[in-house]
């Protein structure tokens, strides 16, 4: 976990490093909101966060902002649930898990939608192009085994989209009976599929772009065709931040500005993403991924509500939450509406 502390430029006239720790994030005993901790996972769909950090949008808030990096979603969820972070830039399904377990988490903005591609061996891609949904049965008949998919853990956003594709879009039966799934970290998907340990993956950018450059691999489908408008990540906050009207409106306003920045300055935004993500994501790769259908960045939370409800049903079915989460318990629309007035 990496921590970067900043202090508002407009207050001090210079950029200084804040020293507020987690214990002082929200003041004690219900006091005023003096500072917030923003946590993120360094994945490409969190593009607005990279812009907000590199372009100094967090600096322009009226409070101290501490930015913390988490290596994965589960660790971010644990920190949010324990009160160690106040604002999270992460997946919508982790937010559902938090709410299900009694932690207040309200989604203020979307980050993106339609964020995955099904990448597979060229053999499977060709078979799917010819046979469609029947490709799964044909492959098993020819190879004596099911297609092996690699994807993050059950209940994650890509896992849910993969299940939706198999069960609802293609209608080929229950997920577990149709494919064999291995749980893999997205960053390891390229190595895993190229080594032959899996046949296909539901994967985000820029890893889809890397796999697509391999002539032995090909794109099978885009998640925007599978589950149109499905969410990926968003910005969600705890109750204390939610009640700080000026702060949440400022956060949402900065997010909207970041989305506009991505649209008008995609090359610079890609460079910002590469500089923060690291881990083999070069500027050239980040720029190339900007041209992908799976790079669709938005802020308006209402654009993903219906799809999030469907996704919540699936998260419940795999057992990550007890029951689907009601929209009013997951989203807070007022801040976005206010900055649009």
Describe each model-derived feature in a short phrase.
Residues 42-70, 74-75, 96-101, 160-169, ...:
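Short, polar/charged alpha-helical segment
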Residues 31-43, 63-68, 146-150, 180-182:
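Short, well-ordered beta-strand elements
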Residues 185-275:
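Pocket-lining segment of extracytoplasmic ligand-binding domains
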Residues 44, 67-78, 91-93, 174-195, ...:
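Short helix-initiation/N-cap motifs at beta->coil->alpha
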Residues 1-21:
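N-terminal secretory signal peptides and thylakoid transit peptides that target proteins
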Residues 312-341:
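Conserved C-terminal helix/tail region of periplasmic/extracytoplasmic solute-binding proteins
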Residues 111-184, 239:
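A conserved helix-loop-strand patch within extracytoplasmic ligand-binding domains
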Residues 245-321:
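Secondary-structure end/capping motifs
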